[in-house]
Amino acid sequence: MFDRAQSTIANVDPEIWQAIQQENVRQEEHIELIASENYTSPAVMAAQGSQLTNKYAEGYPGKRYYGGCEYVDIVEQLAIDRVKALFGAEAANVQPNSGSQANQGVFFAMLKPGDTIMGMSLAHGGHLTHGSPVNMSGKWFNVVSYGLNEAEDIDYEAAEQLAHEHKPKLIVAGASAFALKIDFERLAKIAKAVGAYLMVDMAHYAGLIAAGVYPNPVPHADFVTTTTHKSLRGPRGGVILMKAEYEKQINSAIFPGIQGGPLMHVIAAKAVAFKEALSPEFKEYQQKVVENARVLAQTLVKRGLRIVSGRTESHVMLVDLRAKNITGKAAEAALGNAHITVNKNAIPNDPEKPFVTSGVRLGSPAMTTRGFGPQEAELVGNLIADVLEHPEDAATIERVRAQVAELTKRFPVYR
């Protein structure tokens, strides 16, 4: 028997409790600009910490390999119904434990080792799981990569030529570091012309898509994968949306194909997040995310920094640091010392190594969640520029850190 009053983390494991408290302070006192990070609601976190973590539920609602699943069936069905409504999908699988496993599930269902896939080059803003040679997708399949044109937009004409030349079985759309809107309809036409499936990985853009401020790939793609965190502001996990005709294949690929028992506490948290995302408040939030990103990018340009693609049409932007003679690694460290959290990121055709890079990636979802508006976004842009102009000046770092402290105190994450 467990005594809730005594079985607290603080009592059971003081070392872990201390680390959690330190991380809480960091999140409250630092400005979070990593585009793939966000803050979940207390309701989402409560679902993840619920008794549902105790329940094994191999299978799917109404067809389980374990008894006692009548209530987790309700939870999973709610998650399925809500995410279908959110994106207008015919079918959904909410069991993938991550976005990478969602992608792997589609590959496992529809491809065989040695098949040809075509995806956006990691060097141009794609994702590891879209065919990078260091990932299983690049090891198991023959990969053809498309990228950006001279204007740093997706080179759709080159992608079309590659598709006709190589006849891929599956085309992957989506990116992890691309700021503009993706023409999913055009990519769908390319896929159809060569007899390929189209899979869209919308992990970065899912929250924006749910709110209608970014193009929805669901009407155009055979499969749409996503994480449930990032801009969607849910728990860490994955989802696959699909045409109804592929539901059985995808479900079998996830279980028993690549996963065993689903994480029911996480699926409950996904359901809560989907309900939050269906609200009018969430749409307003995403509109602010896009506006804050636009203001942040414009401010950086005014301060002499170059934004890859020249602008952002979403929540994310890549900053080219070469004109400032500073690497992404050094910029990440300097901004971190000022309590502004970013991640170093390669720019298109980056001459630096992946652990060094010539750029940083910035995103607006987390700062918007804590209440920042255009005025704060402009201030943050100027603070970033101040640090990048004097990355080794202790007085500048101290001044910016003090301004960050004042700003984060006015806009707490959790009251």
UniProtKB/Swiss-Prot annotation:
(6S)-5,6,7,8-tetrahydrofolate binds at residues 122, 126-128. Gene3D superfamilies: Aspartate Aminotransferase, domain 1 (3.90.1150.10), Type I PLP-dependent aspartate aminotransferase-like (Major domain) (3.40.640.10). Its cofactor is pyridoxal 5'-phosphate. InterPro entries: PyrdxlP-dep_Trfase (IPR015424), PyrdxlP-dep_Trfase_major (IPR015421), PyrdxlP-dep_Trfase_small (IPR015422), Ser_HO-MeTrfase (IPR001085), Ser_HO-MeTrfase-like (IPR049943), Ser_HO-MeTrfase_PLP_BS (IPR019798), SHMT-like_dom (IPR039429). Catalyzes the reversible interconversion of serine and glycine with tetrahydrofolate (THF) serving as the one-carbon carrier. This reaction serves as the major source of one-carbon groups required for the biosynthesis of purines, thymidylate, methionine, and other important biomolecules. Also exhibits THF-independent aldolase activity toward beta-hydroxyamino acids, producing glycine and aldehydes, via a retro-aldol mechanism. PANTHER family: SERINE HYDROXYMETHYLTRANSFERASE (PTHR11680:SF50). This is Serine hydroxymethyltransferase 1.
